[in-house]
Amino acid sequence: MVRLGGRRCHTIWRVFSQRERRDLRECLVAAAQVDERIGAAAVVGSGATHSEDEWSDIDLAFRLAKGLQPATVIDAWTGRMYEDYGAVDHLDVWSGSTLFRVFLLSSSMQVDLSFWPWETFGASGTSFRLLFGEANEPTSSSSPAPATLIGWGWLYALHARSSIARGRHLQALYMVNGVRDHVVSLACVRHGLPADHGRGVDDLPPEVMATIADTLVRELRRDDLTTAFTNAITALIAEAEQIDPGLASRLREPARELVRTACGPRAEPTEDALP
């Protein structure tokens, strides 16, 4: 047991409960309040909107004092997570000058701590609730650029085609999934839903979800891979049509060729499955 800011904070060593998650978050916030290098803190994600469920993680954003960078504080906070709360590993993700350090605890809880330079700390969406201190004026959140998503979609499709044709079924599965992932992101952007990591996919209209379901590989066989690939690239072209009809028109011919040659370079033309 450790004490932070007058609170008793128990080390977590088993599958976590919602109460344990709440207690740990309160302890981390209390520690931030007495850390002179932290000027403000906010809870982000589902915790900011009180929409957590039993599987939600802890997601806290810290505003560093003026002139400080994440390297100034990260070692102390990392030590705290390992020594007091049973962290077993962590992953660093940088976004500009902001460091997101993602911890995995022995209880299987995920704890995301982000360290923001003074001048960049602030809300970029609705999932931001200030706990103490002050934040900069909110900025508009940015969705992935649709043209970039389309580009990644056809790039995965190129490699899906060659993987199927070479009989490399597991690699083909990976590539077909990549096409589908970008179709999902495009659909989420189009419907105003969170586009990262499939967060909005289950809130898409039923007909869109049905189209996405058709891109799943049912069995690891050439025929099933080819069917899923055809459906995935068809869905990609359909999403492109919603955003840039001219681009969709230019992509149709190479898309048809990808589907045709997925069975090998000498494959005969088949019935046109693309719109």
For the regions a language model picked out, list residue spans one by one:
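Residue-identity detector for glycine
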Residues: 5-6
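Metal-dependent nucleotidyltransferase catalytic core
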Residues: 9-36, 47-49, 55, 62-113
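Hydrophobic/anchoring residues in structured secondary elements
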Residues: 40-43
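Short aromatic-enriched loop/helix-cap "lid" or pocket-rim segments at secondary-structure transitions
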Residues: 53-56, 124-126, 201
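A short, sequence-level motif marking secondary-structure junctions
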Residues: 115-120
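A short, charged helix-loop
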Residues: 122-148
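Conserved nucleotidyltransferase catalytic core and NTase-mimicking acidic/glycine-rich helix/loop elements
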Residues: 138-275
